Swiss-Prot record:
Its EC number is 2.4.2.59. One of its GO terms (biological process) is thiazole biosynthetic process. Pathway: Cofactor biosynthesis; thiamine diphosphate biosynthesis. It comes from the Archaea. The gene is thi4. Homooctamer; tetramer of dimers. It comes from Methanococcus aeolicus (strain ATCC BAA-1280 / DSM 17508 / OCM 812 / Nankai-3). Involved in the biosynthesis of the thiazole moiety of thiamine. Catalyzes the conversion of NAD and glycine to adenosine diphosphate 5-(2-hydroxyethyl)-4-methylthiazole-2-carboxylate (ADT), an adenylated thiazole intermediate, using free sulfide as a source of sulfur. This is Thiamine thiazole synthase. Keywords: Iron, Metal-binding, NAD, Thiamine biosynthesis, Transferase. It is an enzyme of class 2 (transferase). GO terms for molecular function: iron ion binding; pentosyltransferase activity.
Amino acid sequence: MDISKIDLKADEKAVTKSIFKATYEMWMDNLEVDVVIVGGGPSGLTAGRYLADAGVKVLILERHLSFGGGTWGGGMGCPYITVQSPADEILSEVGIKLEEGEDGLFVADSVEVPAKLGTGAIDAGAKVLTGIVVEDVILKEGKVSGVVINSYAINKAGLHIDPLTINAKYVIDATGHDASVACTLARKNEDLGLVIPGEKSLWADEGENGLLKYTKELFPGLFVCGMASNATHGGYRMGAVFGGMYISGKIVADMILEKLKNE
């Protein structure tokens, strides 16, 4: 590259027009999808990759401007997380390097993990949107049939601006400890009889195995995975061990693939 011959062109109108056009086309292509995953954390990204890799049209919505959830900070700011077998296989599939830790654990870089999980989901065909908050669901004829969305910046500013919607065959609540989608459904529709107990304190073994047990279809059309599954069933938290989160993402993907196959 001969830098002396470079003359960069950037017409202001062309920049704006290009962005608006691409944004319009993107939304037109994603207003109706097979699966909406709310939350781009460990389990959400894992589920998105497996679903997209199987040819499912997947949209992952993350309210923050970066995906990965709490993985980036590792354990108390130390730049590593731990996983157990067989979750190490899920990370290895996207080229994440693992080192042996204590008592059968594997150690992974807390920046490399979300970066490669995210690009893995995108490369598989999932669409990831950041800065979008899901504030409600579409509830029609006793089934969750999509999500109600808004800009997270608008939401944080407290502005009264009406939301828009995305239709989906299935919605996954992968919002972590808050289980915000499930909680909103229960709070706004008391007649459904949904009770969300919230998560318990930390017990790593029980928390990890709870993720596998509680990953399920919580309500017709609404699945829970990752910490949202424990929060909706009164399970324990587990700290900076993530194996159950990744396996939970694969479990929910397999459940939905089976549903789609039988439609």
